[in-house]
């Protein structure tokens, strides 16, 4: 699978300040805190933030960044996405992929006929869902596990799920 190495991947969003010393609450989009810590430096709207400390919290994680030293600075980050370039993510085995790599791939039916482009991956609790936009800009969703066959440069969608 060919991935855009400079594409920014959001790993967490700052949800607010925690305390008065500049710590922030994070809503993580990864389950692995150790892997999150390993990135070390994140981009926040183009500004680098260096992770000093990370700990679990009932509402997600609490983080301290070297550049943020008081509550006002922490509050100013509310809603900010913490990103890393796609190339910073670890390589995966040949039969695995990151969902971000699926976005933008052309989607075809089993005969190879174009049906649209993948535009999003969602999870509403029952499994991962791929959203596809047709040429007429109408969108439909298919369950990834049952309906999508992933190839390096396109996705094959099972006929039963095509609208």
UniProtKB/Swiss-Prot annotation:
Record carries keyword Signal:
no
GO biological process, alphabetically ordered: ribosomal small subunit biogenesis; rRNA processing
Cross-referenced Pfam families, in alphabetical order? Answer: PRC_RimM (PF24986), RimM (PF01782)
Cellular compartment(s): Cytoplasm
Annotated GO CC locations:
cytoplasm; ribosome
Which terms are listed as keywords in the entry?
Answer: Chaperone, Cytoplasm, Ribosome biogenesis, rRNA processing
Q: What family does the Swiss-Prot or TrEMBL record give for this protein?
A: Belongs to the RimM family.
NCBIfam families in UniProt: 16S_RimM
Give the PANTHER family listed for this entry: RIBOSOME MATURATION FACTOR RIMM
Tell what the record comments on domains. The PRC barrel domain binds ribosomal protein uS19.
What is the role of the protein in this entry?
An accessory protein needed during the final step in the assembly of 30S ribosomal subunit, possibly for assembly of the head region. Essential for efficient processing of 16S rRNA. May be needed both before and after RbfA during the maturation of 16S rRNA. It has affinity for free ribosomal 30S subunits but not for 70S ribosomes.
Q: What is this protein called?
A: Ribosome maturation factor RimM
Organism equals: Zymomonas mobilis subsp. mobilis (strain ATCC 31821 / ZM4 / CP4)
